[in-house]
UniProtKB/Swiss-Prot annotation:
One of its GO terms (cellular component) is extracellular region. Belongs to the three-finger toxin family. Long-chain subfamily. Type II alpha-neurotoxin sub-subfamily. This is Long neurotoxin LNTX28. SUPFAM superfamilies: Snake toxin-like (SSF57302). GO terms for molecular function: acetylcholine receptor inhibitor activity; ion channel regulator activity; toxin activity. Binds with high affinity to muscular (alpha-1/CHRNA1) and neuronal (alpha-7/CHRNA7) nicotinic acetylcholine receptor (nAChR) and inhibits acetylcholine from binding to the receptor, thereby impairing neuromuscular and neuronal transmission. Keywords: Acetylcholine receptor inhibiting toxin, Disulfide bond, Ion channel impairing toxin, Neurotoxin, Postsynaptic neurotoxin, Secreted, Signal, Toxin. It is found in: Secreted. The keyword Magnesium does not apply.
Length: 91
């Protein structure tokens, strides 16, 4: 009986997800599971020389904290799964 109980306890621990992992977009359609300690999804946008004809450049990803904002760069941060979609694909 003790062996059965021990086996059930071990299986429960193995099957449980003991830590929450965040999922963030890394491109318009692809997402990844963030590394431990990366608790924020971000979407960074900025203009380059072709901004008028091609639109803003975009960078997606995971981070431990929201990246610093520099002049001319817009950053949006969030902390739920896939919360950083491409601006044109938002509901």
């Amino acid at each position: 009986m003790k062996t059965l109980l021990l086996t059930l306890v071990v299986m429960t621990i193995v099957c449980l997800d003991l830590g929450y992992t965040l999922i963030c977009f890394i491109s318009s359609h692809d997402s990844v599971t963030c590394a431990p300690g990366e608790n924020v999804c971000f979407l960074k946008s900025w203009c380059d020389a072709w901004c008028g004809s091609r639109g803003k450049k975009l960078s997606f990803g995971c981070a431990a904290t929201c990246p610093r904002v520099n002049p001319g760069i817009d950053i949006e941060c969030c902390s739920t799964d896939n919360c950083n979609p491409h601006p044109k694909l938002r509901p």
